[in-house]
Amino acid sequence: MLSALARPASAVLRRSFSTSAQNNAKVAVLGASGGIGQPLSLLLKNSPLVSRLTLYDIAHTPGVAADLSHIETKATVKGYLGPEQLPDCLKGCDVVVIPAGVPRKPGMTRDDLFNTNATIVATLTSACAQHCPEAMICVIANPVNSTIPITAEVFKKHGVYNPNKIFGVTTLDIVRANTFVAELKGLDPARVNVPVIGGHAGKTIIPLISQCTPKVDFPQDQLTALTGRIQEAGTEVVKAKAGAGSATLSMAYAGARFVFSLVDAMNGKEGVVECSFVKSQETECTYFSTPLLLGKKGIEKNLGIGKVSSFEEKMISDAIPELKASIKKGEDFVKTLK
């Protein structure tokens, strides 16, 4: 049922170029000058769903904004530079996307980014809590398994926490799963949908191939290899880029897909489903990614895990200890802040 509800991967990006969509979303990108931020900002500028695009970073944002502002689409673009300009960037925003932070290099795990990115995310989300407390917050900055608990605890500190509006963007895992399944089966990836649950790092990434639409079957050895490739796809890109960065273009695509789905739902479109790492009661983990029915106020309904195979069931139980540790690490970090 979950997979049937979820739209094919590219449908939402295609819609973002249609002229009938409401053009009213005010979107901020924090970390807009970086490897993900620039192509993400380009995709957002290209969409009629967005009426105002505000870009923030600690360097180069005026140039990125000037460059994007010449594109012949409706969204107005303005760049903001440095902490003193951050409040103005956020005022009146409906959606804030946070790709800010340092990328992975070869040999690094997403968790190795924690010390740097935890501080960046805490600082940026604190500003969001003060200047756009009602906005949808979409966190791309890794490690997502920790940066979402950080975001939640920061919002709690400011007394404006709403669990239905804070999202860890795991969409790239779904995009990769769709692509890799389509490659193996000779299908159009735009017509494949694989729910991916759990978290957004290594073995916490749990593709539910048994729930794939259309239904696909793999022998166990191929299924194990496919699952491993989906889990380590980010590392595949880091290695291929040989020290020159991590997944930026595919992450920008996935981030834009999630934002467009969210804005569609905020505009009243029904049946919009995306997986995301959010506050959850679906497992013993306090945060967990599952398919979510999105609505005007964020999460309308958590659609849960659904029926899974014994292979997937084992992956879920194996992921929980690591997820719990990452969640605790994020929550404990906020306790150390002034």
Swiss-Prot record:
Superkingdom as given in the UniProt entry: Eukaryota
CDD domains: MDH_glyoxysomal_mitochondrial (cd01337)
Binding-site residues for NAD(+), renumbered to this chain: 31-37, 57, 117, 140-142, 251
Main location: mitochondrion
Transit peptide per record: 1-24
Modified residue annotations for N6-malonyllysine: 239, 307, 329
Reaction equations catalysed: (S)-malate + NAD(+) = oxaloacetate + NADH + H(+)
N-terminal signal peptide: none
PROSITE patterns named among the record's database cross-references: MDH
Modifications the protein undergoes after translation, according to the UniProt entry: Acetylation is enhanced after treatment either with trichostin A (TCA) or with nicotinamide (NAM) with the appearance of tri- and tetraacetylations. Glucose also increases acetylation.
Keyword Glycoprotein attributed: yes
Binding site for substrate: 104, 110, 142, 176
Catalytic residues in the record: 200
EC identifiers of the protein: 1.1.1.37
Residues with PTM N6-acetyllysine: 78, 91, 165, 185, 215, 239, 296, 301, 307, 314, 324, 328-329, 335
Any one of the GO CC terms: mitochondrial matrix
Residues with PTM N6-succinyllysine: 78, 91, 185, 203, 215, 239, 269, 296, 301, 307, 314, 324, 328, 335
GO biological process: aerobic respiration; malate metabolic process; NADH metabolic process; tricarboxylic acid cycle
Modified positions (Phosphoserine) in chain numbering: 246, 326
Pfam families from the UniProt entry: Ldh_1_C, Ldh_1_N
InterPro entries reported for this sequence: L-lactate/malate_DH (IPR001557), Lactate/malate_DH_C (IPR022383), Lactate/malate_DH_N (IPR001236), Lactate_DH/Glyco_Ohase_4_C (IPR015955), Malate_DH_AS (IPR001252), Malate_DH_type1 (IPR010097), NAD(P)-bd_dom_sf (IPR036291)
Protein's name according to its UniProt entry: Malate dehydrogenase, mitochondrial
Species of origin: Pongo abelii
